[in-house]
Each structure stands twice: as C-alpha cells, then as structure tokens.
Design a protein with these regions (language model features):
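C-terminal and inter-domain tail/linker signature
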Residues: 1-142
Length: 142
C-alpha cells in the first residue's frame, strides 16, 4: 500500500528531476494555478522565470537532496546546491568558479501540486564564492 508519505516523496523526486534538468515547463506543471512563494502569490510562469538568470549564469546548477521530511501536506527539504559560474550573475561576470551552498525549502501540497513554498537559499555564500567583495583589480577597488 502506498502511503501519503511515499506519494509526496515520489512527487518531490519527480519535481527535483525537472529542476535538475532545468525543465522550466516541467517544473511549472507541479504548481497550482496560483502558488504562493514566500507568501507572495504568483502564477507558474512567474515562478519559473526566477530560475532563468540562475541557470543562465550557472548552467550546471544542481540540487542534491540531503534530507526530506513529509508531515501531513507539507514537504521539508534540505539541499546542497552546486554550480559553476559560467555567465554574468547579479553584476559579476563569469569567473569559472564552482559554488556550493545550502538551501532549505518547505512546500505545502494541495491536490498533488505545490500551492505554497517557502525557500531559504544561501545566495550570499554563492556571491562570496564567485568573488563579490574581493579586490579583483589589485588596487583596493572592487
């Protein structure tokens, strides 16, 4: 017998596969018609559009699930996220540096789709790893 826990775990693994393949249409298919992201209502295309600059700058961006907890209609995940900085990102030109960050996400599932998501990704660590704040010119300037 398949439990709700097993069903939600499988749902999330299917979603994560789309994420790691950078399949934005596939990702959007897992969202309700209006999904709240960090309490802000959005439509699926607006959610997936947020991934475009990230994937453009880090074409090998990859989420590795470290932990998953299912509690009722909620899925909590802890990830290690990696990628190589191959394109401009938030004003920093490509460095070729590899980044590794932590991410924590909580999903609320309704009718087999994600209706709400709260996400905390350590993007400050990614920015430090690609050199934001470093003296890149050797003269004290940034």
């Amino acid at each position: 017998m398949v439990t709700q826990h097993d069903e939600y775990r499988s749902l999330y693994q299917s979603y994560l596969k789309c994420c790691n393949e950078h399949d934005l249409d596939g990702m959007a298919s897992f969202y309700t018609s209006t999904i709240k992201v960090n309490d802000v209502p959005m439509d699926p295309p607006a959610v997936t559009a947020q991934f475009e600059p990230l994937i453009s700058a880090f074409p090998d961006w990859h989420w590795e699930m470290r932990h998953i907890v299912v509690d009722g209609d909620y899925i909590a995940c802890h990830f290690t996220v990696t990628g190589t900085h191959r394109g401009a990102f938030q004003g920093v030109e490509a460095t070729g540096r590899r980044v590794t960050i932590s991410e924590f996400t909580l999903y609320h599932v309704e009718d087999g789709k994600f209706a709400e998501v709260w996400d905390l990704a350590d993007m400050d660590a990614a920015m430090r790893q690609i050199g934001l704040g470093e003296d890149r010119h050797g003269d004290g300037s940034r």
